[in-house]
Curated annotation (Swiss-Prot):
This is FMRFamide-9. Belongs to the FARP (FMRFamide related peptide) family. One of its GO terms (biological process) is neuropeptide signaling pathway. The keyword Cell inner membrane does not apply. The keyword Secreted applies. It is found in: Secreted. One of its GO terms (cellular component) is extracellular region. It comes from the Eukaryota. Keywords: Amidation, Neuropeptide, Secreted. The modification Phenylalanine amide is found at residue 9.
Amino acid sequence: GHADNFMRF
């Protein structure tokens, strides 16, 4: 989900 992508940053 987009939440996971945010954490990757």
